[in-house]
């Protein structure tokens, strides 16, 4: 079974935390990843070489690695350069996710250049994080092995909505041949199922599983609305 086939029809859990989260730290991310594996997840998405190394030692699942690096010179921060991609690969990720939007990068590299470097120098697969249909088509043409709706709603020019961009999933499935992954604001099993009904190859869920404070807040807010 190929690496991509291992992900087909399954749940990928994004194990990430912000510095101000109570569960921030590589040991916690590794524990979340192990819990996800025990629950039946088919893959893990993780940020930073440190977290990826810790998770690699804890689970046998495929890891989609990213490295979020902010810069005053660019809005692009998800694995914004070939150097960042190399660090992700060396940490143990089998698939490297990159921001595949056409926005300029601090490294001055193009999406195509980064994808080529990942394929030829690192021998890894590429997940292209995109925000629009046009970006998904361009990412496929640039050589991406799969596209993900990760950035829909997180760029000023894409739809701003509370739930997942299922319409983008539907559009991509009709226009690209590579696997389409649904990611972003998927909070319930019903929304995940709806993504698969739209043709998603796999689904990525993060905060709805791995950020307890957000999970708690959703329950609290729902209870308040009932009063």
Label each region the model flagged.
Residues 3-23, 27-30, 164-227:
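C-terminal alpha-helical cap/extension of soluble enzyme domains
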Residues 16-18, 38, 67, 71, ...:
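Glycine-rich phosphate-binding active-site loops on the catalytic face of alpha/beta enzymes
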Residues 127-128, 170:
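Intrinsically disordered, low-complexity proline-rich segments enriched in Ser/Thr
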Residues 1-90, 126, 134, 138-141, ...:
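Conserved N-terminal beta1-alpha1 strand-loop-helix module at the mouth
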Residues 46-47, 66, 99, 129, ...:
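Structural motif
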Residues 22-26, 45-64, 75-81, 100-118, ...:
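Active-site-adjacent beta->alpha loops and helix N-cap segments on the catalytic face
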Residues 61, 122-124, 178:
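A short helix->loop->beta-strand "cap" motif at the edges of active sites that frequently abuts
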Residues 38, 90, 120-121, 141, ...:
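Residues at the C-terminal ends
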């Amino acid at each position: 079974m190929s690496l991509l086939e291992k992900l087909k029809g399954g749940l990928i859990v994004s194990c990430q935390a912000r510095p101000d989260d109570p569960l921030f730290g590589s040991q916690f991310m590794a524990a979340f990843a192990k819990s996800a594996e025990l629950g039946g997840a088919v893959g893990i998405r993780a940020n930073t070489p440190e977290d990826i190394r810790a998770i690699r030692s804890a689970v046998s699942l495929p890891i989609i690695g990213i490295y979020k690096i902010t810069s005053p010179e660019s809005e692009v921060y998800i694995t914004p350069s070939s150097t960042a991609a190399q660090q992700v690969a060396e940490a143990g990720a089998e698939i490297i996710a990159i921001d595949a939007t056409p926005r300029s990068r601090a490294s001055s590299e193009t999406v195509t250049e980064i994808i080529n470097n990942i394929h030829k120098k690192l021998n890894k697969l590429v997940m292209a994080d995109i925000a629009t249909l046009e970006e998904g088509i361009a990412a496929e043409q640039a050589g991406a092995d799969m596209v993900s709706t990760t950035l829909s709603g997180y760029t000023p020019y894409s739809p701003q909505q509370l739930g997942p961009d299922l319409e983008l999933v539907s559009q991509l499935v009709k226009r690209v041949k590579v696997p389409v992954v649904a990611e972003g604001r998927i909070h319930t099993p019903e929304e995940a199922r709806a993504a698969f009904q739209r043709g998603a190859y796999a689904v990525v869920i993060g905060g709805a599983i791995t950020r307890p404070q957000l999970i708690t807040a959703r329950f609290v807010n729902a209870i308040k609305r009932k009063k």
